[in-house]
Amino acid sequence: MHLFINMIFLINIVFIISIIFIERRNPQTTWAWILILTFLPILGFIIYILFGQNITREKNFKRKILDDKTKQKYLNSFKSHYKLDNISLKYKDLIMMNFNNDNSTYTQRNDIDLYFDANSLFEEMIDEINKAEKFIHMEFYIFKSDEIGKKILQALTKKAKEGVEVKLLVDSIGNSIHKKDIDKLKAAGGDFKIFFPGFCKYINLRINYRNHRKILIIDSKVAFLGGFNIGDEYLGKDKNIGHWRDTHTKIKGLAINDLEGRFLLDWSYANESDLDIDLKKYFINPHSTDLPKKIIGAQIVSSGPDHTEQQIKNGYFKIINSAKKNLFIQTPYFVPDEPMLEALRLAALSGVDVKIMLPGNPDHKFMGWIANSYFESLLNAGAKIYLYEKGFLHAKTIVADSSICSVGTANMDIRSFSLNFESNIFIYNEAISKSMEEQFFKDLKVCTKVTLESFEKRSIISRIGESITRLVSPLM
C-alpha cells in the first residue's frame, strides 16, 4: 500500500514538472493543477488523466487539424465578398478578425429569426424536417430519447425512409438516445455517429473535450443554431428546474454555408473518412436568385480545442471593447479569465452600461460559487449583475449598442472558450440586436439585482465555497 501511494506521489511530481516545463499552460491553469495534484494526490492523479493532458490533446487533434485545413479548400470555393453596410462597417475590424481566425465568411443575404421558447422552436424544427427533400444534418450535444426527442427521431426516421439523406451527430457524453431508436434510424437509411466515443460513456481519455454544438441544417434552405438541446427539460417539464429560458436562431441565406461546412468537417472527423462532397448539393451559390432579399450581416464563428486561437472568446472580447453605450450579457456559467474580466471592468469604468444576467438557481452549486467570486470586482467597477429567478437561464448571448449581437452555444467561461467545440453566429444588424435587447429587458422583470450591500450579506458557507472554487476555476 505504501509503495502504491509513493508511486502516485512520484507520478504526480512528474505531472507537475510536465505542466510547468513542457506543456507551458497559462499561469492560472498551471497553479490550479499544481494545487489539485499536491493536495489531492490520488484523486488528482485520476482527474489529471481524464481532464488534464495537453499531450494527449495534441495527439487527439493532430489529424483533425490537418483534415480541417485540407477540407477547408472545398469550402473556400464558395466564399463570397460584400461591401459592408453602415452597421457592419462599424465592426470591420471584428469581421476581419473572425475571417483571419476562423475563415468565417461575412455574408449579407440572410434572414434570421430568434426563438426564446422551446415549444415554438421544436415545433418549427419538426416542421422544417418534415419538408426536407435532399438532406438533414443534425449535430447536438444533448439528445434524449424522451417525448420530444422521440418525436424528432421519428421525423428523422420517416424522412430517411423517403430517401432523404439524414446524418445525426451527437456528443458521447451528452447523448442518451436509446439503442433501439438509433437502430430504427439506421434501418431506415439514416446515418448516426458519436463524437469522441470512449471505452464506455464516462471512461474516456477525451472526456474533457466535448462537442457542445447544437446545429440543424435542412437542404441548405434553413438552419438552426443556439443554446437549446433536445430534451423534455427544455420544455419546462423537469419539476426540479421549471421554466427553461434559452435563445436560438433560425437562419436562411448564405450564412448557412459556413455552418454546413462546420458540420461536414465534424462529421468527416467522427466518421474517420475523407470529405467527398458535392458542393452544389450542400452549399448555396452566392449568385442564386432564391436568396433572401434582406440585408442582414452575419458570420458563423466556431472554436474548439483543436485550434490555438480562441475564436469565439476573441469575438466577445472585441464586442466588449467596442461597446460605447451599453453591453448586455446572458450566460448560464460565468467563469471569465483575467483578460475577459478586466475588459468587462474597463467597459463599466468607461461609462458603458454593463449588465450581466446569470441564473439565480444554478444547476451546479459550485458553478454558482465560482460566478459569485467575480461579483465584487465587477460591482465595484460599476457593472450591474442580475440573477434570473423564473426557472433556469441557459441563453448564451451578448448584445452591444443596439447594433451587434452574438447567439450560439458558447458560455462565457473558460471551458467554452478553450475546451469545448462551439459555434456562434455574430449578427451585424440593428433590428435583430434590438429584439435581443427587448428580450433582455423582459427577462429583467423576473430577476433579482445584486448590489454590493446584498452581496456582502451572503453566508459564510458561500464565502468559503467561492474562495475554494475560484482556485480551480481555470479548469472549469
From Swiss-Prot:
Superkingdom in the source lineage: Bacteria
GO biological process: cardiolipin biosynthetic process
Keywords (A to Z) from UniProt: Cell membrane, Lipid biosynthesis, Lipid metabolism, Membrane, Phospholipid biosynthesis, Phospholipid metabolism, Repeat, Transferase, Transmembrane, Transmembrane helix
Membrane topology, as annotated: Multi-pass membrane protein
Primary site of residence: membrane
Known role: Catalyzes the reversible phosphatidyl group transfer from one phosphatidylglycerol molecule to another to form cardiolipin (CL) (diphosphatidylglycerol) and glycerol.
Name of the protein this chain belongs to: Cardiolipin synthase
Recorded GO CC terms: plasma membrane
Family: Belongs to the phospholipase D family. Cardiolipin synthase subfamily.
Enzyme Commission number(s): 2.7.8.-
Catalytic activity: 2 a 1,2-diacyl-sn-glycero-3-phospho-(1'-sn-glycerol) = a cardiolipin + glycerol
One GO MF term attached to the UniProt entry: cardiolipin synthase activity
TM annotation in the entry: 2-22, 31-51
NCBIfam families tied to this protein: bac_cardiolipin
Disulfide bonds: none
Catalytic center residues: H212, K214, D219, H394, K396, D401
Species assigned in the record: Clostridium perfringens (strain 13 / Type A)
UniProt keyword Transmembrane present: yes
PLD phosphodiesterase domain location: 207-234, 389-416
Compartment(s) where it occurs, according to its Swiss-Prot or TrEMBL record: Cell membrane
